[in-house]
Amino acid sequence: MESLTLQPIARVDGAINLPGSKSVSNRALLLAALACGKTVLTNLLDSDDVRHMLNALSALGINYTLSADRTRCDITGNGGPLRASGTLELFLGNAGTAMRPLAAALCLGQNEIVLTGEPRMKERPIGHLVDSLRQGGANIDYLEQENYPPLRLRGGFIGGDIEVDGSVSSQFLTALLMTAPLAPEDTIIRVKGELVSKPYIDITLNLMKTFGVEIANHHYQQFVVKGGQQYHSPGRYLVEGDASSASYFLAAGAIKGGTVKVTGIGRKSMQGDIRFADVLEKMGATITWGDDFIACTRGELHAIDMDMNHIPDAAMTIATTALFAKGTTTLRNIYNWRVKETDRLFAMATELRKVGAEVEEGHDYIRITPPAKLQHADIGTYNDHRMAMCFSLVALSDTPVTILDPKCTAKTFPDYFEQLARMSTPA
């Protein structure tokens, strides 16, 4: 297996313009494909997950052109639901941001489509979404294991009164919200259970509004969506920087700044993960906000005990930042780490122990006490981009760290290690 050893880093300083947000990129691509008119998307993320969405749209007859660096996409919308000619199989890798929304959108009309992906995708639950779509009339079969992909979709979704479980993934609700306006009938979506990662629903609603569709949101418990609507292209749309990707650089600034400035997100950003900066501030770093930048300056870091349900992806970065904080850090209400690219609670606990931390792994929490001195270890990444990027921070000590399968960052940030090196002064 390929590996990358990062030597100790004395200081991290400088600015980085962030690649586009994965969450925004894949939502914008799907809405542009469903919309009337041509949309020009700029600062699109070039990554595995976005390529899977683009390949799927192409197979569904959507025409688009990409710039040489794949960050600008001119896409001609279909002016309504996507149609497959004949039976189609779409391979979506491990891209939840493609699998979940497409599973819903392709239930409009009368298609026959199979959605499949990598082995890990077949372990990521989708049963709650399928149950909700079936309530709206969709014909869906599981081809292997009940409640998991691959799925066969045979259209049939018309809207109506639908319940969705909000406790596992906000992507299920996102998928229903984006599909419902194109259903022939009105849809009432009721959320049962605690809604996880609520800020991601705000991204969805924000983008739907940009494409001309507004819905009634009753305290995130019930959404009322008029049927028979159309999405309309906004013309040009700038994808904001990825706030989850910003977390690694901001944390590096907190641990070993200098000052690190990330551009492409700021106080006006719609992504909930910008709140990660508030957590660093609570830990002792100094944060400066602009409309389109966030800067972080080193501080004396101390442990925190916090509910992280609102920023689950960025919370992973706090777990490795905790190695540099005084005291024991507790991250709570993060059960949905277990159904991501890997079981992130298990993976994080396992790898933190390798570098010497004392770790308590609960059903939905993790408690981390840093060692007096970090140990050099080979870090397993579990084919999970965020594991690789989180554990790069270990090099901000006087100990090297070896990252196994470093190229797994291609899911959201192909040149992450080059960018980190560019801003780092070796010890």
From Swiss-Prot:
Active site: 313
Location(s), subcellular: Cytoplasm
EC identifiers of the protein: 2.5.1.19
Chain positions recorded as phosphoenolpyruvate binding sites: 22, 96, 124, 171, 344, 386, 411
Recorded GO MF terms: 3-phosphoshikimate 1-carboxyvinyltransferase activity
Any one biological process term the GO annotation gives: chorismate biosynthetic process
Known function: Catalyzes the transfer of the enolpyruvyl moiety of phosphoenolpyruvate (PEP) to the 5-hydroxyl of shikimate-3-phosphate (S3P) to produce enolpyruvyl shikimate-3-phosphate and inorganic phosphate.
Family the UniProt entry places it in: Belongs to the EPSP synthase family.
Name assigned to this protein: 3-phosphoshikimate 1-carboxyvinyltransferase
Organism, scientific name: Salmonella typhi
Gene for this chain: aroA
